[in-house]
A protein has these predicted regions:
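PRPP/pyrophosphate-binding module of the type I phosphoribosyltransferase fold
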Residues: 188-193
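Ser/Thr-glycine-rich phosphate-binding loops at phosphate-binding pockets of nucleotides
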Residues: 181-187
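Nucleotide/phosphate-binding catalytic cleft detector across ATP-hydrolyzing
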Residues: 1-176, 195-209, 222, 231-284, ...
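Long, charge-rich alpha-helical interaction segments
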Residues: 213-224
C-alpha cells in the first residue's frame, strides 16, 4: 500500500502511528519493547486452545526482534527489551519498532514519513533519522520505499492536534504551553500560534518511567524482594488495578503519593524555564503520563486554564500527520504539482 504521509511517534513507552485510510485517520499502537524473537513458540502447537501473540519478526542488522501489541511486557530476568536512554533513536530497537509500525500498517511506499524527537535532543539526532530512514528499507518482509523524512519536536504534534481538534480553545493570537509527559522524558513547548519560543521551551529526562521506578523501589523495600518489571506497574496504574506480587494484591496509590517528589522536581524545572505565565491562553497537557502529572501541574500553574487532550497517546502522531500533509502540500504548490 502506498501512502502520502505516514506519521510515527516512536516513544519510550509506546509506538504510535497515524495515516490516512480514505477519509479516515487510521491509528495503531504497541509497546516500545523489542525483545529478541523466540524461535520455538509453544503457542503454535496449542491446537487452537493457546492463542498466538500478535507480533511480527522484524530484522535489523542481522538480528530478529519481536514487535507488536502481543509482545511480552516482562521477561524471566526483568529485561523486556525496552531502551531508556537519550540516544534511543540510534539503537537497533528504535529501527525495529519503526519497521514494525510500517509492517503492521501494510505500507510499502511512503512519500513523506514524519518522526518526532524530544525537544532537548532534536538538534543532536534529527539528521541521523533523516539519513537512516530515507530510501529503501527492508525489515525481512520485502522492500519499503521512503521518499523523504521530516523530524519535528514531539510536543509540536500535540499543539497541531489541539489546533485541529480543540475548536475555540486554540487561540492563534496568543501563546499556549504544551506539556508532553512521555515515558522517559517530559517536554514542553511555549508557542505563539505555531511559532515556538525556544527560550521558554525545553525538556527533561523526568517522564513516567522515573515514577514507576520509584514505586518499584519502595515496593521492593517493603516486600524485601527485587521489583524490576515497571511495565506491569505502568499497566496497573493506567487500569486502576492493584499489582499482583507473589500472590498479594498491592495497592499502588500510596506508593504513587510517596513518589510525588520526582514529579514535583520536573514541574519545578519547567516553571523555572517558562517563567511568568500571564501571557498563556492555556496549558495543553498530553502524553501517556499526563494523568500522573496533572495534579502537580494544576498546583504549579493555578491561574492558567489546563486543557487535557482526549486520547493523549495519539495526539503527537495525529499532529505529525497534519504537519506532514501541510508541508507536502506547500512543496507541491511551490513546484506547481497538483496536490
Amino acid at each position: 500500500m502506498k501512502v502520502s504521509v505516514f506519521a510515527v511517534d516512536v516513544g519510550y513507552g509506546n509506538t504510535k502511528t497515524a495515516f490516512r485510510m480514505g477519509s479516515d485517520i487510521a491509528t495503531q499502537m504497541f509497546p516500545s519493547v523489542a525483545p529478541i524473537a523466540v524461535s520455538d513458540a509453544v503457542s503454535s502447537y496449542g491446537q487452537g486452545v493457546l492463542h498466538s501473540r500478535k507480533v511480527l519478526p522484524i530484522e535489523v542488522d542481522g538480528a530478529t526482534y519481536e514487535i507488536g501489541p502481543g509482545v511480552e511486557l516482562s521477561s524471566a530476568y526483568g529485561n523486556a527489551g525496552r531502551t531508556l536512554s537519550e540516544d534511543f533513536c540510534l539503537t537497533a530497537n528504535y529501527a525495529a519498532l519503526l519497521g514494525g509500525s510500517l509492517q503492521f500498517a501494510g505500507v510499502t511506499e511512503v512519500e513523506r514519513m514524519v518522526l518526532g524527537l524530544p525537544v532537548h535532543t532534536i538538534n543532536k539526532f534529527s539528521a541521523h533519522l533523516r539519513d537512516a530512514f530515507t530510501g529503501t528499507l527492508n525489515f525481512g518482509h520485502g522492500d519499503i520505499r521512503i521518499h523523504s523524512v521530516k523530524v519535528v519536536p514531539q510536543p509540536l504534534g500535540s499543539l497541531v492536534s489541539f489546533s485541529e481538534y480543540g475548536g475555540s480553545r486554540f487561540d492563534r493570537e496568543n501563546a499556549h504551553m504544551v506539556i508532553d509527559v512521555g515515558y522517559f522524558t517530559t517536554d514542553w513547548v511555549v508557542a505563539h500560534g505555531f511559532t515556538m519560543n525556544d527560550r521558554r521551551s525545553g525538556g527533561a529526562p523526568g517522564g513516567a518511567s522515573q515514577v514507576y521506578k520509584s514505586i518499584a523501589s519502595l515496593i521492593a523495600k517493603n516486600e524485601k524482594e527485587p521489583v524490576d518489571d515497571i511495565e506491569r506497574i505502568d499497566k496497573c496504574l493506567r487500569e486502576k488495578k492493584p499489582l499482583l506480587f507473589y500472590g498479594k494484591d498491592i495497592d499502588l496509590i500510596s506508593y504513587l503519593d510517596q513518589s510525588q517528589a520526582i514529579i514535583n522536581s520536573t514541574v519545578k524545572e519547567m516553571q523555572n524555564r517558562v517563567g511568568r505565565t500571564a501571557d498563556l491562553r492555556s496549558i495543553v497537557l498530553t502524553g501517556g503520563g499526563a494523568a500522573l502529572y496533572e495534579p502537580a501541574i494544576r498546583a504549579a500553574f493555578p491561574r492558567v486554564q489546563l486543557d487535557v487532550l482526549d486520547a493523549p497517546c495519539y495526539a503527537n502522531a495525529k499532529g505529525f500527520l497534519i504537519v506532514g500533509e501541510a508541508t507536502l502540500a506547500r512543496e507541491r504548490k511551490a513546484l506547481g504539482v497538483a496536490a
